[in-house]
Amino acid sequence: AEAVAVNAAHETAVMVAPFEGEAGFAGLLADARRNALLIGPGAGVGEATRACVHAALTAPSAPSVVLDADALTSFAGDSATLAALISARARPVVITPHEGEFARLFRGHDEVLGAVGKLARARTAAQALGAVVILKGPDTVVAAPDGRATIGCDLPPTLATAGSGDTLAGFVCGLLAQGMPAFEAASAAVWLHGACARALGPGLIAEDLANALPRILQSGDLIANA
């Protein structure tokens, strides 16, 4: 509820819907129009966030789900529980960890953390969870449970700014909401994220990335690099 008030105060184009507790969140999920959901940024680490993730992954409306930041850290060392929730659903799940969040989530999972190389770790994690994994960094890897993978090369160092990863997760969620398959949505979001940063240049902040997206979508660069 606190985050809703903050966002409502300065994002006039965003519709907000406050809720309290698990019952309130379940009420939001009951609306089938909410076909894609992002949980994590600013959510806080703990049981309340775990409960929201559980509710989202078991909701009868079965939205596509993106998990980032605090949603992942709330399952630190307990990736098996998350995998069990994901395996019981048909709709896609995408997780978007940076290296620290990845290591916390898969703590104790030697098969994942012991895989040699970032590509192998992302692929092993995707297979273990049954989710698309975006393992962020200057060479962001997108891996699907079926073994497909893409690598975002030459991503600008200007993306290493607070909130940039949250914006990427939002890009993924937006593409999922439009019906794009999960692996393709994740790969496209990584490319768009980098393209926005390249267009903006030095000095960008996270809010700039979303504002730059329409220009990138309308540009010839999108067609040339498709």
Q: Model segments located where?
A:
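Amphipathic alpha-helical interaction elements
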Residues: 110, 177, 198-201
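Charged C-terminal helix
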Residues: 10, 195-226
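Alpha-helical transmembrane segments in multi-pass membrane proteins
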Residues: 36, 40-42, 161, 169, ...
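Short pre-catalytic strand/loop immediately N-terminal to key active-site residues, enriched for Gly-Thr
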Residues: 151-163
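Short, small-residue alpha-helix embedded
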Residues: 104-107, 161-192
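Gly/Ser/Thr-rich beta-alpha loop segments that engage phosphate groups in nucleotides
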Residues: 42-46, 139, 165-168, 172, ...
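Glycine-rich phosphate/dinucleotide-binding loop and adjoining beta-alpha-beta core of small-molecule
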Residues: 1-154, 222-226
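Short, well-structured alpha-helical segments that form the helix of a local strand-helix-strand
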Residues: 118-126, 182-195, 206-214
